[in-house]
């Protein structure tokens, strides 16, 4: 899986596929939409940011190739409409990329974390993923095929000080949902996987913390295990395209970790050792 900036001989790897991308009005979703269209897919992006979503579509391609549908993933009727609109327009659904996710906006400490904020993040990150999968499965089961991909996080199987408890809990839940759905839907030829990226300087982070993308990348690089390069939205999009397409036709239940080995290391140990020997 090379960078999307590198010429790829498999430019038609998603030819004639129909994909829905939730959270498609920016960040990883927008980048993935661009890549999917480049690879020959018909794409419907969904978001609550109508102006941004329509602008993304206008910038990428014509309405017959990419279109926008307003969708709040916490509302069953919105997700149902999203899938039904896609079927009406394109006749099928091959790929569902459940990419919506939000961060907590309250303090890290369990004593200070907001109750309503916890419910909000859980609702969007987990219930939203559930609804997206439910309505994708509704049309994929009769077709006996399909690929569902979720955006998880390295927080789906790790935890760290400063990363909110609710965000960590929701991403663990997304990984659990991936595994559980894989178990049920395999019978119908439907694959279910997720991607777990390290830090990406997306609007999700820059907007919440009020810093620009270069500062996020600087901090991410300082903490990273793999030096000399940065993880960008294009790299995550490459991973999603792999899981969405036929190249991964026998891959299901996978949590594809994109972290440069970060979660395979224990940065606290060498730091403590250095201080101890100083």
From Swiss-Prot:
Q: What does this protein do?
A: Oxidoreductase involved in lignan biosynthesis. Catalyzes the stereospecific conversion of (-)-secoisolariciresinol to (-)-matairesinol via a lactol intermediate.
Q: What class of enzyme is it?
A: oxidoreductase
| Name assigned to this protein | Secoisolariciresinol dehydrogenase
User: Which residues take part in binding NAD(+)?
Assistant: 23-28, 47, 73, 99, 171, 200
Annotated residues that bind substrate are located at 104, 164
Effect of substituting residue 171 to A: Abolishes enzyme activity
The subunit structure is:
Homotetramer.
The biological processes this protein is annotated with in GO are:
lignan biosynthetic process; protein homotetramerization
Q: What is its EC number?
A: 1.1.1.331
Signal sequence interval, chain numbering = none
Enumerate the InterPro entries for this protein: ABA2-like, NAD(P)-bd_dom_sf, Sc_DH/Rdtase_CS, SDR_fam
Task: Describe the family membership recorded for this protein in Swiss-Prot or TrEMBL.
Answer: Belongs to the short-chain dehydrogenases/reductases (SDR) family.
State the CDD domains in the record: secoisolariciresinol-DH_like_SDR_c
Q: One GO molecular-function annotation for this sequence?
A: nucleotide binding
């Amino acid at each position: 899986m090379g960078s999307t900036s590198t010429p790829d001989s498999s430019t038609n790897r998603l030819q004639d596929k129909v994909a829905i991308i939730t959270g498609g009005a920016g960040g990883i979703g927008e980048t993935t939409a661009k890549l999917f269209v480049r690879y020959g897919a018909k794409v419907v992006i969904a978001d609550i940011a109508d102006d941004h979503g329509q602008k993304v579509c206008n910038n990428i391609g014509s309405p017959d190739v990419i279109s926008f549908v307003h969708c709040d993933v916490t509302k069953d009727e919105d997700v149902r409409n999203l899938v039904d609109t896609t079927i009406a327009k394109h006749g099928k659904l091959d790929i569902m990329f459940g990419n919506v996710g939000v961060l907590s906006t309250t303090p890290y400490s369990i004593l200070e974390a907001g109750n309503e904020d916890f419910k909000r993040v859980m609702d969007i990150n987990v219930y939203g993923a559930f609804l997206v999968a439910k309505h994708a499965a509704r049309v994929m089961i009769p077709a006996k095929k399909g690929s569902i991909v979720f955006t998880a996080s390295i927080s789906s199987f790790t935890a760290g000080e400063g990363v909110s408890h609710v965000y960590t809990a929701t991403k663990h839940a997304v990984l659990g949902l991936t595994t559980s759905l894989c178990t049920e839907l395999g019978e119908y030829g439907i694959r279910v996987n997720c991607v777990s990226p390290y830090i990406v300087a997306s609007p999700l982070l820059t907007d919440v913390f009020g810093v620009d993308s270069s500062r996020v990348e600087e901090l991410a690089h300082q903490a990273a295990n793999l030096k000399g390069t940065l993880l960008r939205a294009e790299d995550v999009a490459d991973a999603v395209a792999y899981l969405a397409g036929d190249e991964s036709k026998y891959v299901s239940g996978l949590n594809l970790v994109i972290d440069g080995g970060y979660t395979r290391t224990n940065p606290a140990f060498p730091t403590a050792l250095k201080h101890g020997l100083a």
